[in-house]
Curated annotation (Swiss-Prot):
Family under the similarity heading: Belongs to the small heat shock protein (HSP20) family.
Gene3D superfamilies: 2.60.40.790
Stretches the record annotates as Disordered: 146-173
The protein, known as: Alpha-crystallin A chain
Record organism: Aquarana catesbeiana (American bullfrog)
Length: 173
């Protein structure tokens, strides 16, 4: 069973009539006129309008999948290196924290920080959890589930983030 935190099609209640990138996870990449004035850009040039349904990985939305035998979290962290990321398990939650110091980009100087926390299934085998960062900046946290009669230990422990050389393909919905 796939569990999506927020499906891209139902991103905002007002759909294309609401500035849709203001609070997304694409900090520091600049804003366009259609981000602030969606009515103006669509009426002046309807053929130049920004796509209403951007790809999943371009939107900064995390994806949580929990099926019968595996639990997986995919998170777009393309602006962070493995050294900037901290992943740890604390009781029934996994906490993912990313922070990098101020650096220069195309628009000036920027520093980024985020903190995400996800509840883990009670039957997740915490001793077999892996966490990797793909070449295209997708952090994948995953682990197998145990038989329902067993219970995993709940304590605080860090999870190392390994670096993969190949990009992650976008997950299918």
């Amino acid at each position: 069973m796939d569990i999506a935190i927020q499906h891209p099609w139902f991103k905002r209640a007002l759909g294309p009539f609401y500035p849709n990138r203001l609070f997304d996870q694409v900090f520091g990449e600049g804003m366009f006129d259609y981000d602030l004035f969606p009515f103006l850009s669509s009426t002046v040039s309807p053929y130049y309008r920004h796509s209403l349904f951007r790809g999943f990985m371009d939107s900064g939305i995390s994806e949580v999948r929990s099926d019968r035998d595996r639990f997986t979290i995919n998170l777009d962290v393309k602006h962070f290196s493995p050294d900037d990321l901290t992943v740890k398990i604390l009781d029934d939650f996994v906490e993912i924290h990313g922070k990098h110091s101020e650096r220069q980009d195309d628009h000036g100087y920027i520093s980024r920080e985020f903190h995400r926390r996800y509840r883990l299934p009670s039957n997740l085998d915490q001793s077999s959890i892996s966490c990797s960062l793909s070449a295209d900046g997708i952090l994948t946290f995953s682990g197998p589930k145990m038989m329902s009669g067993l219970d995993s230990s709940h304590s605080e422990r860090p999870i190392p983030v390994s670096r993969e050389e190949k990009p992650t393909s976008a997950p299918s919905s």
